[in-house]
From Swiss-Prot:
Family: Belongs to the NAD-dependent glycerol-3-phosphate dehydrogenase family.
GO CC annotations, alphabetized: cytosol
Organism from which the protein derives: Stenotrophomonas maltophilia (strain K279a)
Gene name, Swiss-Prot/TrEMBL: gpsA
GO biological process: carbohydrate metabolic process; glycerol-3-phosphate biosynthetic process; glycerol-3-phosphate catabolic process; glycerophospholipid biosynthetic process
Disulfide bonds: none
Name under which the protein is recorded: Glycerol-3-phosphate dehydrogenase [NAD(P)+]
UniProt cross-references to PANTHER family, sorted A to Z: GLYCEROL-3-PHOSPHATE DEHYDROGENASE, GLYCEROL-3-PHOSPHATE DEHYDROGENASE [NAD(+)] 2, CHLOROPLASTIC
Amino acid sequence: MSTTADKIAVLGAGSWGTALASLLARHGHPTVLWGRDAAVVEAIDQRHENPRYLPGIPLPDSLRATTDLASAVEGAAWILVVTPSHAFGETVRALAPLRPAGAGVAWATKGFEPGSGRFLHEVAREVLGEDVPLAVVTGPSFAKEVTQGLPTAITVHGDVPEFAQMVAEAMHGPAFRAYTGDDMVGAELGGAMKNVLAVATGVADGMQLGLNARAGLITRGLNEMLRLAAAIGAKPETLMGLAGLGDLVLTCTGDLSRNRRLGLALGRGQTLQDAVREIGQVVESVQTADEVMRQARRHGIDLPISDRVRAVLHGEQTPEEGLRALLAREQKPEYPDTLFK
């Protein structure tokens, strides 16, 4: 069990990394935030603001920031990685020789390893070795609301219960509820797939297809999550909780979601390039859609919504063509007989 005297290192000074570092610092933990952008790091360390990702939101005076990875992790009780998925492997590999003995590694990154489609816990385990406690932090949470102190609930799934509990206890507070679990596969799957499905609901809303269509896409999107989860050995209850349904609903309905905003722009006729440029931050769904479908093909699972999103993002179909393809599918039972058995 950690105490408020234990240092925590947070790697990644984007909006979510800054929000979680701010949360930990407000809870009394000595927290150091590492980032690559010297201007952003200086602003956080000296002016207690992240002007690029969370402008106008004050950060705790106690939060320190640095561009020196070795300095950031030195003496840390545990380390939290919060980078985009495409930078996760590189960050963990840089961390490996610097990690203090006994320090567990958690991450709040959502997605798969680009190219291989591997889960991030597989990447971390390969790089860090078998003896390092690992955990994934996930759930319905917008960075801006967390830094504003608005109520939020997340879940921490780990392969060592004591480490997952340590991470959850450090984050848990008056406006931030942290639960625990042991299904890292399900937790990571939900956090990745919801980004793809948020594009679908954004496209539908951008095309002004109505609330019925949005509700249908969310529900059938959850069905896709559950079917892929069953195929890869995840627990269905994980996908029905904060890591799956909770994150799915938030990302599909909240306009703070970058992936939903991407879908809205595409549904209104913008190009992918213009939409991504306008959003101005990493949009995980562009790469994640490929990796979700790679997993689906590997396990022989049909994911029609996710596949149409992938096709639209690659310019293989227009949003209108993707919609027609979904509506033209044959009638069938809502759930396979074997899904919950």
